[in-house]
Amino acid sequence: MSVATQPTIWLADPIPSTCKAWLSERSTLVDGPSSDVEAVVVRTATQVDRALLELMPQLRCVGRAGVGVDHIDLKACTERGLVVVNTPEANTESVVEYAIALLLDAVRPRADIPNDSSHELWESSRRQLTGGRRLAEYRIGILGFGRIGQRLGKVLQVLGAEIAFHDLKDESHFPRGFSSRSLEDLFAWSDIVSVHVDGRSENRGLVTGELLESLGPSGLLLNTSRGWVINTRDLQHWLAHHPQARAILDVHEEEPVPMADPLRNFSNARLLPHLASRTESAVEAMGWVVRDVMAVLTGSEPNHRVC
């Protein structure tokens, strides 16, 4: 492809250098929206709304380096006849590994021996860090049973845990061997609930105080999906009134978490900086959405088409 015929692409958000170099050999990269742009590549920071789309009249493709597309106006894209592509399988294993690690942190606490540790510290550490139950003795509910939820369920089953799930889709859409429950029943049945729902607007505030109360005074809530899925005020009330309850939150309604966020003051809330998908290999795999972008621009069918 000659320079004269290369498509113009805007990298709205940064992608790995290997992916950018590959794309730069096949296209002309620009720093912002313009009338010449035929494709835009985004991660999570850039909101692709109607106003932005109007700045790019020649646009043909939106590439999402990642999975969720709730920050992309799919209706507007469809009306314009734009193709939206993403990388739905790029970070599944990274998120599942991270969720398992956080669950093990919660049920099997551990610590290193300090270099200057005494006999008394050794004994007190053994007493304080003794886990209550093995992971296999917990009932674990998975809220949202897509790629990540299903993979997590399979891994937890191998470890011996009893698994149930809730999803908007009918049970017939999912593999056998997992129990489907209503949203209310899932929280009432579970010792631990791990949240893996998508970014559709209907999921905002999905986890209410009533559901948290049914999870119980010693329940554990893990969220690696979207921060706004949980009603924050209800979560604070639940944690304040149930000291044995715990929340592990990798995602937050506002990121970075504000210094004034009340959840910072809860000893039974663990706040993490949105790390679930952050392995170098997963980030690079997400960056390779540029291959599907080029497929669209050269008239081929992409591997992962959203609309």
Positions of predicted regions on the chain:
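An N-terminal-biased, well-structured beta-alpha scaffold segment characteristic
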Residues: M1-V85, A188, T208
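Glycine-rich Rossmann-fold phosphate-binding loop(s) that bind the pyrophosphate
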Residues: F145-G146
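Phosphate-binding beta-alpha-beta segment of Rossmann-like dinucleotide-binding domains, i.e.
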Residues: P88-R139, R151
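Phosphate-coordination loops involved in phosphoryl transfer and adenosine-cofactor binding
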Residues: Q6, L59, A136-R139, S218
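Rossmann-like adenosine-cofactor binding region
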Residues: V48-R50, A164, L168-P262
